[in-house]
Amino acid sequence: FVPGALLKNEQTGKSPDITELVGSNHRIDDEKFYQLYERRLMPSLIHASQSSEKSGGALITIPGMGCGAFAGNFQGQLERKIDWVVEKILINHHDKLKGIKGVIFDPNQNPGDCPDSQRKIGNIDYIVKSGEFGTKNSQLKNPAEYGEQFKDTKLFSIVAWDHVSWPGNDFYIGSRETDDGVKAAATDICQTMTVHSGQYDA
């Protein structure tokens, strides 16, 4: 569960992320954007790598974190930036992520200028697959469905986390409107958080 940049605040127009990332010219500072996502993503990437390095390795799916409702005035502009950020993280840190075999970035329902691509970074296959968001099991498929090279890997999926919710977000009240809610519906996260089992009837 990793929050993307919060670039929208309908109450005051400000947030810590806006203050950190957006300059007086109303543009995002690319290096600060990278640093924010690096410090938020790296703990999860390191965990996935270390916990799977001695088995078949990890395949990680990443959604368009912060590209939707929280993008504010930057909606439609962040997909390419996050592609660049993920690629740069893998270039800078692939030697610390030896258990990761593949990373698949799904730029959300608005892929913008972020075309499909595939590249090798160290031992990691980095794949951008646009337009998967909202399709069946788009980020939670059996690893082999993403490619034969991943058939023995363990799937990890980064969840674009709402900044002010428990992991699972609105699925506690039956809504699946967010990446957080959809993945809660597909897993046992609500039960894990609360120790209470529910019933999926949507």
Indicate residue ranges for each PLM-predicted region:
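Macrodomain-like recognition of ADP-ribose-binding/processing modules
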Residues: 1-202
